[in-house]
Amino acid sequence: MTKREYNSQPEMLEGAKSIGAGAATIASAGAAIGIGNVFSSLIHSVARNPSLATTTVLVVTLTLLGGVAAFYLHSFRLKGPLKKIIYLFLVFFIAVGISLIRIKAIHLLGLALPLLVPPLVWNAIGGGGEALPSTGPNGASSYSEWFTYTSDLEDSASSGRTSSSVNQPIQREQAGPSNALPEPAASPVAQQQDHLDQPFGEGGEREARAQEHDRISAEVETITSACENLEAAMVRKAHILLHQRGVTLGDPEDVKRALQLALHDDWEHDIDDRKRHFTVLRRDFGTARCERWNPFIDELRGLGNRQVNARHYVD
């Protein structure tokens, strides 16, 4: 062994140690990323199903205790990056445990609120000494049904199309002498409030509201169908007029688009406005001098139909 080779041995050992330390750091980082992915999926599953939080908290707690024990056993021997990685593991485990505990607390609070809020609301609106609504066979309070009923009434009032039974004033027993002056008619807001004060459960009014909603839906469908029929009639009429004027379009969608643009209005307007514009356009196409024909020709030329030219305009 030469002197040069003998002197190069310490350098080789230092290089091997550096390579080993780098490999250990990379392996530790990879393990940290893998563990992070596992715990991330675990938190997502717990958030979707909070009932698993109790078992998960126990598992994470045991893992955390094991990590703490490993840290105390090896902290005095580990130095450099590995010691920092163990610190990061501890912080990560603590964060995961806190997140799972928070999820469990929110889940328990969500289960308790339906039992606590209805009695408070009942006392706040003046329930006082009146008996609380009875509970069902499953032990669940019927407050949810009462709140659903009142919310349905509010939705009906906001739509402006409530049934006549909802808008009728509630007849109450009048106290005092028979010759007392009649009370003034209650405003619609007061009538609605009196109706909301009633206890829930009259099936006739629910059926009336359902029938009213069905009637409104049927009217909307009728108007929509009429608009679609008018649109189809407009396209057919435009094809006939274009054919009479010697214009042939390769794509029928060009006619439909030109009709829409010739209305000089946005397509996303109300159904009633669409129907009115289609009716006016149909009437104009049926006359000898169509006021909307020239804008219609302009739109066709803008779509790239070279067959449409100045001779197709109406003077």
UniProtKB/Swiss-Prot annotation:
CC per GO annotation: mitochondrial membrane; proton-transporting ATP synthase complex; proton-transporting two-sector ATPase complex, proton-transporting domain
Domain of life: Eukaryota
Membrane-spanning segments: 19-39, 56-76, 81-101
Keyword Mitochondrion set for record: yes
Membrane topology of the entry: Multi-pass membrane protein
Name assigned to this protein: Uncharacterized ATP synthase C chain-like protein
Disordered, as annotated region: 154-214
Entry annotated with the keyword Mitochondrion: yes
Intracellular or extracellular location(s): Mitochondrion membrane
Polar residues bias locations: 154-171
Gene3D superfamilies (UniProt xref): F1F0 ATP synthase subunit C
